[in-house]
Amino acid sequence: MGAIVLLEKSQRVLNSLAVSPVKVSEYILSKVISLGVISSIVAMFIAITLNLDNIIISTIGTFFSSIIFSLLGLILASKASSLNQFIVLSIPIEIICFIPPILNVLLDTKSYANLYPFNICISLISGDKNFIMINILISIIIIIYFITYYFICSSWKKVGGVKL
């Protein structure tokens, strides 16, 4: 996501979008849905080749994971001015996002650890059907969406070196 947004910044695409009738929500949804669909299609092919039982649940888990990481990538890309800066900014996010699920998979963790959003994604990708966890994950996605919306709005207001 960082490379996509930073390429748009370098080509001044965001300058055009800031003055166009495109809404911030449409911009965010276009990025998130396009990458989510691509990752879901790939996940579905992988699940089919591995003969997984719950292909649909696994694909939904992949789609939700893609949405969360795309939204986090948009937040970081809105603050980064170069690819190196984006990579440095993404390191703490990656640690926060990946360490608990790795520990959850490798160790026998308590049930409260299953409320962590990325642990929920891992359990969905594994094929577990838990609709309460899906609702929790959707709620977290909505919260992250509004945070992303705030960051993208503030970055669009600063486009072109002038605060609008």
Specify the residue positions occupied by each region the protein language model found:
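Hydrophobic alpha-helical transmembrane segments of multi-pass membrane transport/permease proteins
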Residues: 1, 89-101, 137-148
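Short amphipathic alpha-helical coupling elements at transmembrane boundaries
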Residues: 15-19, 81, 123-126
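Alpha-helical transmembrane segments and their short interhelical loops
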Residues: 24-25, 32-81
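Residue-level recognition of transmembrane alpha-helices
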Residues: 31-32, 62-63, 90-91, 138
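Structural signal for membrane-spanning alpha-helices in multi-pass inner-membrane proteins
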Residues: 42, 46-50, 73, 98-105, ...
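Transmembrane helix segments
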Residues: 80-119
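Junction motif at the cytosolic side of a transmembrane helix
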Residues: 140-164
